[in-house]
């Protein structure tokens, strides 16, 4: 009965948010600026170490699973790697000045675990410590606040070789030791910590479908992967990530928070899902899709356990929190980071034939999520095949978080769109990115409405990304940056039109 009441409650919540989505959309076209947002609202750009730094063998850095994966033939769309990336390791001062020129308040970047501990554990690489001290100090000297991510997918290869990394609970202690060194060495200046970036993505892409490092899966009769278990490993990885986050949070709160005055959160990848129809089964399917995405990680951190839909559908394959673990996990964050790019339709998957064939975690939700209904797409497409432009989804998602999780502090830790990188597109034409300007204008308008009209507790917004960069399995085929990086001319940075738009936006208080 309790389970049925919960389903009814969540169904009503999905219906309410869907109705809000259909409300007056005039805010989407409203003129906005920094002054449209609350005083103290943070604007910044985001990056990750592996996608931006390059210098993979410089000054004692150890190899990561993404070094291995990107050098494996056929894994990257354009057969590239991130050995150089956009060379931010050497050009950080130039890039910090670009942020300053725009009027950005903050920079979200990640620390490479193997620059601090080349083998994941053991001796500390002081050259790595020195590099991040220089970056943090350079940011602060320009009035830019560092928001530091401790893990953005670049697991030390040594730990994967030794005990399969996130599949082994040993990683909890090893990551905690790494995190504590970061708190000790950087915490006097870093006031916002993010433990993990998109655990849902690296659990699914790395351990279910095998399209990202470390490339483990059993779908399609192991045609694309040599080892793994797509029906169990994603849940084991997710469980160990949640326990690791909670352990690190406990350490920070007990030993560093009072002295350093910082806060600690985690960043999730979150699509919004609209029911494909007003049928109850599709509304419930949209809720399940969200349970198996955001709820998988945020429910334990807020409530101490996984969503009931996951418990009932995954069964014994879903790990169980002990009583003490549940207490440790519950409430172990100060803010929620949301990486939001797009919205899909969701419908009930009554037959689940594909799920029966694949027998993997993706199919467990019993939903089909697609960016089109019939012959119509949900919005215009960016360059990436998965990224459709649906600004209203931002407002709907913020309201969902408000109502389900009690309106916690939220930072939009990533939002952006890409253009294709093609030799047929001249640099002159690539700088004319009106589509990106409209994307950010409309998503920011939707976000502003969620704050001003709906009372959502959103504290900041980070653009992905300052620079074009190496986009994981897509390599250099995709350009997300506000600045164009010329890969054929010494990685020179050129401002796109969106830089000028953001500069005007950030320097206007009207």
From Swiss-Prot:
Q: Extract the InterPro entries matched here.
A: Glyco_hydro_1 (IPR001360), Glyco_hydro_1_N_CS (IPR033132), Glycoside_hydrolase_SF (IPR017853)
Residues bearing carbohydrate: 229, 278, 349, 507
Q: Name one GO molecular function term.
A: beta-glucosidase activity
Disulfide bridges in this chain? 217-225
GO annotation, biological process? carbohydrate metabolic process
Which PROSITE patterns does the protein's record reference? Answer: GLYCOSYL_HYDROL_F1_2
Q: Which GO terms describe its cellular component?
A: apoplast
Q: Signal peptide position in this chain?
A: 1-29
| Residues annotated as binding a beta-D-glucoside | 51, 152, 197-198, 341, 414, 464, 471-472, 480
Active-site residues per Swiss-Prot or TrEMBL entry: 198, 414
Query: Which keywords does UniProt give here?
Result: Disulfide bond, Glycoprotein, Glycosidase, Hydrolase, Signal
Q: What Enzyme Commission number(s) does the record list for this chain?
A: 3.2.1.21
Q: Which reaction does it catalyse?
A: Hydrolysis of terminal, non-reducing beta-D-glucosyl residues with release of beta-D-glucose
Tell me if Signal is a UniProt keyword of this record.
yes
What the entry lists under Pfam families is as follows:
Glyco_hydro_1
Q: Which family does it belong to?
A: Belongs to the glycosyl hydrolase 1 family.
Its recorded name reads Beta-glucosidase 40
Organism taxonomic ancestry: Eukaryota, Viridiplantae, Streptophyta, Embryophyta, Tracheophyta
């Amino acid at each position: 009965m309790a389970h049925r009441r919960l389903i009814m409650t969540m169904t009503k919540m999905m219906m309410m948010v869907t109705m809000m989505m259909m409300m007056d959309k005039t805010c989407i076209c409203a003129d906005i600026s920094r002054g449209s947002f609350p005083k103290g609202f943070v604007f910044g750009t985001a990056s990750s170490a592996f996608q931006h730094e390059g210098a993979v063998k410089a000054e004692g850095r150890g190899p990561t699973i993404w070094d291995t994966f990107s050098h494996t033939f056929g894994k990257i769309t354009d057969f590239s790697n991130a050995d150089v990336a956009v060379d931010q390791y050497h050009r950080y001062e130039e890039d910090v000045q670009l942020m300053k020129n725009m009027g950005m308040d903050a920079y979200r970047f990640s620390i490479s675990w193997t620059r601090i501990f080349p083998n994941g554990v053991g001796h500390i690489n002081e050259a790595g410590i020195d590099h991040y001290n220089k970056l943090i100090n350079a940011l602060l000297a320009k009035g830019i606040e560092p928001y530091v991510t401790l893990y953005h997918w670049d697991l030390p290869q040594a730990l994967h070789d030794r005990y399969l990394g996130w599949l082994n609970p040993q990683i909890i202690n090893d990551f905690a030791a790494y995190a504590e060194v970061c708190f000790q060495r950087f915490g006097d200046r870093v006031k916002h910590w993010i433990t993990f970036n998109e655990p849902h993505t690296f659990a699914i892409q790395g351990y279910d479908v095998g399209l990202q490092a470390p490339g483990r899966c059993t779908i399609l009769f192991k045609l694309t992967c040599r080892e793994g278990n797509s029906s169990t490993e994603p849940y084991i990885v997710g469980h160990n990530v949640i326990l690791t986050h909670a352990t690190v949070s406990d350490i920070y709160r007990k030993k560093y928070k009072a002295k350093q005055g910082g806060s600690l959160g985690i960043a999730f990848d979150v699509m919004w899902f609209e029911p494909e129809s007003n049928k109850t089964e599709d509304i419930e399917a949209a809720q399940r899709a969200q349970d198996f995405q955001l709820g998988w990680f945020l429910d334990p951190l807020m409530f101490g356990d996984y969503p009931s839909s996951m418990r009932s559908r995954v069964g014994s394959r879903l790990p169980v929190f002990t009583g003490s673990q549940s207490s440790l996990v519950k409430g172990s964050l100060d803010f929620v980071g949301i990486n939001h790019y797009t919205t899909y339709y969701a419908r009930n998957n009554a037959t689940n034939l594909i799920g029966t064939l694949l027998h993997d975690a993706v199919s467990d939700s019993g939903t089909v999520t697609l960016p089109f209904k019939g012959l119509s797409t949900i919005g215009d497409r960016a360059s990436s095949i998965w990224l459709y432009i649906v600004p209203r989804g931002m407002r709907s998602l913020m309201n969902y978080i408000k109502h389900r999780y009690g309106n916690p502090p939220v930072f939009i830790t990533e939002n952006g769109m890409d253009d294709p990188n093609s030799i047929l597109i001249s640099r002159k034409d690539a700088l004319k990115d009106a589509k990106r300007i409209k994307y950010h204008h409309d998503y920011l308008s939707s976000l502003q409405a969620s704050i001003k009209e709906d009372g959502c507790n959103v504290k900041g917004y980070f653009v992905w990304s300052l620079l074009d960069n190496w986009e994981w399995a897509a390599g250099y085929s995709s350009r997300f940056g506000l600045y164009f990086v010329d890969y054929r001319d010494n990685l020179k940075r050129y401002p796109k039109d969106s830089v000028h738009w953001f500069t005007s936006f950030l320097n206007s208080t009207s």
